[in-house]
C-alpha cells in the first residue's frame, strides 16, 4: 500500500468516525429534548403549572445543611427527621437507581392578601394551603399518571413523591429551576411567588437537567421581620421550635407560654412570611378547583370551632389537611386564639372545655379563661 493511500484511508476512517459521533450526538439530544417537551406537555395537561428537570445523582450540600439543622435541635419534636436523616441526605439515598428528577409545581395562590384577616380576633386563621382539599390527594394521582407515561416513554423505572417520603423537594426544585429557597427557607418563584405545591418523580432515565435558579432575595428581609415569634435565627435558617406552623400542626403538647399570645388568631399554620414577600406581586390566583378556599374555612368563628366534638370536626374538615391533626390539637389551638381575642363573650366557650377529656385541651381552656378574665 502506498503511503498516500494509507493516509487517505485514515482520513476516510476519521471522517466516518466523526460522522458517526455527530450522528449519535444529534440523535440523542434532540430525542432527549423532544422527550422533555412531551413530558412538560403532559404535565400541563394534568394541571401542573411548572415542570422542570434536575439531576438526581449529582452531589449537593442540602443533606449537610439538614444534618446541622437536626444537630442543633431545631427540628423540635419532629423525630422522624432524625430517624430518616440518612435517607434524606440525597435522592440516591432514597433510591440508588435515581438519575433524573422531574419536579412539578402546582399553584395554590390565594385571590387576595390573607394577612388582613388576622385583624378579626373573634375568627380563626387557617393557612391558605389548608383551605381547600388536601394537596397530597390533589397531586398524587396526577403524579402517578405522569410517572406512568414517563416510564412508558423511557422504558425506565420511576418513583413518585409528594411530601410523604424523606425526599428533600425544595433543594431539588431549586436545582431544577422552579425557584429558590428564600430567607424564610421556603421555595420562592419569580412567576408564582410563594404559592407552589411541589411533587417529584424520580426516574432511572438520564433526561438532562434544566438550569438551576439563582437566589433573588437581595437585601429584602420582609419575611424575617414579620415573623411573630422570631423563628429565623439568621437569613436562610429556621428554628421550627419557634415557628407557628410547627406549633399549630406538629407540636402535640401544651405550648410554651411565650408563644401562646404570639399566635394571635392563627389556629392552623401561619402565612406571614409567605404573604409579605414582594415577589407575590407576580403571582396569580390558583385556578385549581379542588384548591379553592371553602367558605367555612375562611375566618371561621372561634365560638363555633370551640364547640366541635370529634364527629363534627371530622365533618367540617373532610378532605382537608387540617383533619390530620385531630380534634384535640385543633381545639387547643382554638383556645389559644380565644385567649388572645380580647372578647369576653368567648369566655363561656372556653369554660365549657375546662372539663374536656383531653388534658392539653383543659390546660388551654384554663389559660384562655384566665387571660380573658384579666382584661
Which functions belong to the PLM regions below?
Residues 323, 354-355:
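Alpha-solenoid helical repeat architecture
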Residues 313-316, 343-354, 375:
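Amphipathic alpha-helical scaffolding segments comprising HEAT/armadillo-like alpha-solenoid repeats
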Residues 327, 357-358:
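Short inter-helical turns and helix N-cap capping residues of alpha-solenoid HEAT/ARM repeat scaffolds
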Residues 45-48, 222-246, 252, 266-268, ...:
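Iron-sulfur cluster-binding cysteine motifs and their immediate structural context
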Residues 28-216, 255:
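Auxiliary alpha/beta "docking" domains used to position bulky ligands
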Residues 331-334, 365:
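Conserved hydrophobic register position within alpha-solenoid helical repeats
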Residues 337-340, 367-371:
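Core register positions within helices of long alpha-helical scaffolds
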Residues 330, 346, 360-362:
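Positions within the helices of HEAT/ARM-like alpha-solenoid repeats
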